[in-house]
Amino acid sequence: MILYPAIDLKDGQAVRLVHGDMDRTTVFNDDPAAQARSFVAAGCTWLHLVDLNGAFAGEPVNAAPVEAILKACPVPAQLGGGIRDMATIERWLNKGLARVILGTVAVENPDLVREAARAFPDQVAVGIDARNGFVATKGWAEETDVQATDLAKSFEDAGVAAIIYTDILRDGAMGGPNTQATADLARAVSIPVIASGGVSSLDDLLALRDSGVISGAISGRALYDGAIDLAQALEALKT
C-alpha cells in the first residue's frame, strides 16, 4: 500500500482544514516546496497535493506553489482542486504532474473524465468526497443525491487510474479513517482505491493495508502533528 503525504494549499501556504471548513485552517508551513522536500527526504514515493482555493474557485489558484513543488521534488505527484476542463488537465500534465484528480467534474461532466482517461492513460484519478455515503462537490460545499459507490461504479470501464475516496466527516479530525466504507467501495469496483480522511496513527494505516483491498492511503494532519512518523510508517508498510 502506497502512503501519500498530503500538502493542502491555501493562499500559497501548506495548511490543514477540519471537515473541509475553510474557516478552520491551521497553517503548517508557509513554504510548501520545503514541506514537500522534507516528505521526500523521509522516503515517500508519491505526493498528494490539493489546491483548496481552486476547489472553491473552479480553476487553479495555487499554481505557483504547485509548480515549485514539482520542480523541487523527484517523486510523482497527484493534484486535485479546480481541475474542471481538458485545457487545465493538459496544462498540469505538461508541467510534470503525474496524475490529475477530477472531483466535481466527475459528477457534473463524467464524459470529460472518460475523455481525459482515454487521452492520458494512468494519469487521471477520480476524487469521490462523501458525507454519510453521498457525494459532495465544489470543495465539499454542495451535497448531491449521488451515492459514492454508484459514482465509482459508473467509471468502471473508463480507464481511470484510481479512485480517491474521502470521508469528509473524518477529514482533519484525527478520529481514524472509515476503513469499512473505503474497503466496501474498493470491493465494489476493480479500480484501485486510495483512502483519505481521518488517518491518525500507524495502526490506522496498517488497518487500511490489512483490509487487503485498499491500494493507498493519504495522510496530512497526522504527519504534521507528529502522530505518525513518516519514515517509520513507510518502513512498516513494506512488511
From Swiss-Prot:
Pfam families: His_biosynth. It is found in: Cytoplasm. GO terms for cellular component: cytoplasm. Its EC number is 5.3.1.16. One of its GO terms (molecular function) is 1-(5-phosphoribosyl)-5-[(5-phosphoribosylamino)methylideneamino]imidazole-4-carboxamide isomerase activity. Its main location: cytoplasm. The active site is at residues 8, 129. Pathway: Amino-acid biosynthesis; L-histidine biosynthesis; L-histidine from 5-phospho-alpha-D-ribose 1-diphosphate: step 4/9. It comes from the Bacteria. One of its GO terms (biological process) is L-histidine biosynthetic process. Gene3D superfamilies: Aldolase class I. The keyword Cytoplasm applies. It catalyses: 1-(5-phospho-beta-D-ribosyl)-5-[(5-phospho-beta-D-ribosylamino)methylideneamino]imidazole-4-carboxamide = 5-[(5-phospho-1-deoxy-D-ribulos-1-ylimino)methylamino]-1-(5-phospho-beta-D-ribosyl)imidazole-4-carboxamide. Keywords: Amino-acid biosynthesis, Cytoplasm, Histidine biosynthesis, Isomerase. It is an enzyme of class 5 (isomerase). HAMAP family: HisA (MF_01014). Belongs to the HisA/HisF family. This is 1-(5-phosphoribosyl)-5-[(5-phosphoribosylamino)methylideneamino] imidazole-4-carboxamide isomerase. The lineage of its organism: Bacteria, Pseudomonadati, Pseudomonadota, Alphaproteobacteria, Rhodobacterales.
